Design a protein with these regions (language model features):
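Hydrophobic alpha-helical bundle architecture
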Residues: 86-89, 190, 202-207
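Short, amphipathic, aromatic/basic-enriched membrane-interface segments that mark the entry/exit
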Residues: 2-4, 45-46, 63-73, 89-92, ...
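Membrane-interface helix-loop-helix junctions at boundaries between adjacent transmembrane segments
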Residues: 72-151
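Structural signature of hydrophobic alpha-helical transmembrane segments
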Residues: 40-56, 91-100, 187-196
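Alpha-helical transmembrane segments in multi-pass membrane proteins
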Residues: 10-18, 49-62, 77-81, 85, ...
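Long hydrophobic alpha-helical segments that form multi-pass transmembrane helix bundles
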Residues: 116-200
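C-terminal ends of transmembrane helices
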Residues: 58-70, 106-116, 201-207
Length: 207
C-alpha cells in the first residue's frame, strides 16, 4: 500500500545519518589524518559490499516467499536491508553477512507471514545469529576495526567502562575516549552504532 511504502521510505531516510557517518567513521578509524572525503571513500569501500550483499540476499528471500505466497514483494526489505549492515562490525566476512541476512529474513520475518506479522526484528535476529554462531566475529573483549595494521583491534567504550566500577570506570573511560568523541561517534564499533548524534537525528526525523 501507499502508506506502507511511505513509512518504509521514511525509516530508510531516518537511517541515512547513521549509515553515512558509519561509512566515514570506518575510514577515520583507519587513518584520522586523512581528509573527510578520503575517509568516506575508504569506508564506502568496506561498507558498500556489505549493503549490496544484505539487499541482494534479503531481496532474493523476499521474492522467493512472494512467489510461494503469490503476492507482491512489499517494501519491508528496504528497511531490513539497511538495518542489517548497521548492526554488523565492518570487518565481518561477506559470506557471513549473506548467511545472517538469509537467517534473519526467513526465521525473523517470513515464517511469521512477512512484514507486519513478524514478532522479531529481522536485523536483530541476524545479529543474534552471528553472535551465537560466529562469536569471534562479533563478541569478546575486542571489537575489530579496519586498519592498515593486520589484526589491530581496540576495546569498545562499554567494555572499557565495564572493566572497572564507579568513578574508576568513568576515569578510565575519560582516559580512552572523550565524551564528545562518544557523542559524535569517533569511536570503534559496529557500522551504525557509534554516533549518538546520528541516531538522535534519525529519531527526531521519525517524530
Amino acid at each position: 500500500s501507499v502508506d506502507l511504502k511511505r513509512s518504509m521510505i521514511f525509516v530508510v531516510i531516518a537511517m541515512l545519518p547513521a549509515i553515512l557517518f558509519g561509512i566515514f567513521n570506518i575510514g577515520y578509524q583507519e587513518d584520522p589524518t586523512r581528509s573527510i572525503l578520503d575517509n568516506f571513500i575508504s569506508g564506502l569501500i568496506v561498507v558498500g559490499p556489505i549493503i549490496v550483499i544484505s539487499y541482494s540476499v534479503g531481496g532474493l528471500c523476499e521474492v522467493i516467499f512472494a512467489i510461494i505466497r503469490k503476492h507482491e514483494v512489499n517494501e519491508g526489505f528496504l528497511v531490513t536491508g539497511m538495518l542489517i549492515p548497521l548492526v554488523m562490525p565492518p570487518t565481518i566476512p561477506l559470506w557471513m553477512v549473506a548467511v545472517a541476512t538469509a537467517f534473519g529474513v526467513i526465521i525473523g520475518k517470513e515464517i511469521f507471514g512477512g512484514t507486519g506479522f513478524n514478532i522479531f526484528n529481522p536485523a536483530l535476529v541476524a545479529r543474534a545469529f552471528v553472535f551465537f554462531a560466529y562469536p569471534a566475529q562479533i563478541s569478546g573483549d575486542l571489537v575489530w576495526k579496519v586498519s592498515k595494521i593486520d589484526g589491530l583491534s581496540t576495546a569498545t567504550p562499554l567494555l572499557t567502562a565495564s572493566s572497572k566500577q564507579g568513578t574508576e570506570a568513568l576515569d578510565l573511560l575519560n582516559g580512552v575516549y572523550s565524551w564528545s568523541d562518544m557523542f559524535f561517534g569517533f569511536i570503534p564499533g559496529s557500522i551504525g552504532e557509534t554516533s549518538t548524534l546520528a541516531c538522535i537525528i534519525g529519531g527526531v526525523f521519525l517524530l
